[in-house]
């Protein structure tokens, strides 16, 4: 429980001073789920909040794992998703629109990572028993982020046949 309060205070101070994606994500989570982003999701399961390890505890935790993987991909591309600011709107507390005004590819992709996470959360059951979950109980193999990558067949256009392999 002590870890939860430390993380909540840290997240609260980061979110209150950030001018980027973390504030955008907080606004999205709260508008769409009706829950406090900090009190309900920081420290939920094994992946919601900072870091993560082990097997995700439930569907909400899987949403957070996927979001961590999405951010890792952005870091690998040289983006700074915790602080990259993007423009978005939320319509009817359910529809998130990433604005065409977003200037950089990093801004656009960060918005999409956050949007996909919040849409994922919207369709899952929140379990109080995983709020403030101690990571000492996060055991088992850590799922590889490659599980979220589309198979090669989905990358090609549907109206084109894949190129035949080159002869040896």
Curated annotation (Swiss-Prot):
Q: Where is this region: Required for localization on the plasma membrane?
A: 139-168
Which family is it part of?
Belongs to the phospholipase A2 family.
In the UniProt record, the gene name given for this protein reads PLA2G2F
Protein's UniProt name: Group IIF secretory phospholipase A2
Short name of one Pfam family? Phospholip_A2_1
Recorded GO MF terms: calcium ion binding; calcium-dependent phospholipase A2 activity; phospholipase A2 activity; phospholipid binding
Q: How does activity depend on pH?
A: Optimum pH is 7-8.
Cofactor info, note text: Binds 1 Ca(2+) ion per subunit.
Signal peptide residues on this chain, from the entry's feature table? 1-20
The source's domain of life comes to Eukaryota
Point out the glycosylated residues in this chain: 92, 102, 123, 144
Catalytic activity as recorded in UniProt: a 1,2-diacyl-sn-glycero-3-phosphocholine + H2O = a 1-acyl-sn-glycero-3-phosphocholine + a fatty acid + H(+); 1-hexadecanoyl-2-(9Z-octadecenoyl)-sn-glycero-3-phospho-(1'-sn-glycerol) + H2O = 1-hexadecanoyl-sn-glycero-3-phospho-(1'-sn-glycerol) + (9Z)-octadecenoate + H(+); 1-hexadecanoyl-2-(9Z,12Z-octadecadienoyl)-sn-glycero-3-phosphoethanolamine + H2O = 1-hexadecanoyl-sn-glycero-3-phosphoethanolamine + (9Z,12Z)-octadecadienoate + H(+); 1-hexadecanoyl-2-(5Z,8Z,11Z,14Z-eicosatetraenoyl)-sn-glycero-3-phosphoethanolamine + H2O = 1-hexadecanoyl-sn-glycero-3-phosphoethanolamine + (5Z,8Z,11Z,14Z)-eicosatetraenoate + H(+)
Name the Enzyme Commission number(s) assigned to this protein.
3.1.1.4
CC per GO annotation? cytosol; extracellular region; plasma membrane
Q: Which residues cross the membrane?
A: none
Q: Where is the catalytic site?
A: 67, 114
Cofactor requirements of the protein: Ca(2+)
Q: Where does Ca(2+) bind?
A: 47, 49, 51, 68
Cystine crosslinks:
46-138, 48-64, 63-120, 69-145, 70-113, 79-106, 98-111
- What tissues harbor this protein? Expressed at high levels in placenta, testis, thymus and at lower levels in heart, kidney, liver and prostate. Highly expressed in rheumatoid arthritic tissues, including synovial lining cells in the intima, capillary endothelial cells and plasma cells.
**What's its job?**
Secretory calcium-dependent phospholipase A2 that primarily targets extracellular phospholipids. Hydrolyzes the ester bond of the fatty acyl group attached at the sn-2 position of phospholipids (phospholipase A2 activity), the catalytic efficiency decreasing in the following order: phosphatidylglycerols > phosphatidylethanolamines > phosphatidylcholines > phosphatidylserines. May play a role in lipid mediator production in inflammatory conditions, by providing arachidonic acid to downstream cyclooxygenases and lipoxygenases.
- InterPro entries for the chain: PLipase_A2 (IPR001211), PLipase_A2_dom (IPR016090), PLipase_A2_dom_sf (IPR036444), PLipase_A2_His_AS (IPR033113)
């Amino acid at each position: 429980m002590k870890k939860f309060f430390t993380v909540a205070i840290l997240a609260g101070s980061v979110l209150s001073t950030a001018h980027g994606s973390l504030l955008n994500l907080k606004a999205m989570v709260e508008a769409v789920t009706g829950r406090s982003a900090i009190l309900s999701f920081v420290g939920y399961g094994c992946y919601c909040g900072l870091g993560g390890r082990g097997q995700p505890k439930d569907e909400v935790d899987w949403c957070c794992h996927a979001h961590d993987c999405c951010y890792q991909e952005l870091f690998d591309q040289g983006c700074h998703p915790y602080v990259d600011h993007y423009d978005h709107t939320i319509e009817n507390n359910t529809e998130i629109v990433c604005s065409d005004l977003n200037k950089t590819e990093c801004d656009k992709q960060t918005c999409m990572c956050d949007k996909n996470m919040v849409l994922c959360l919207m369709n899952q059951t929140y379990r109080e028993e995983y709020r403030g979950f101690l990571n000492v109980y996060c055991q088992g193999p850590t799922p590889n982020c490659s599980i979220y990558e589309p198979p090669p067949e989905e990358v090609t256009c549907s109206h084109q046949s894949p190129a035949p392999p080159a002869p040896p």
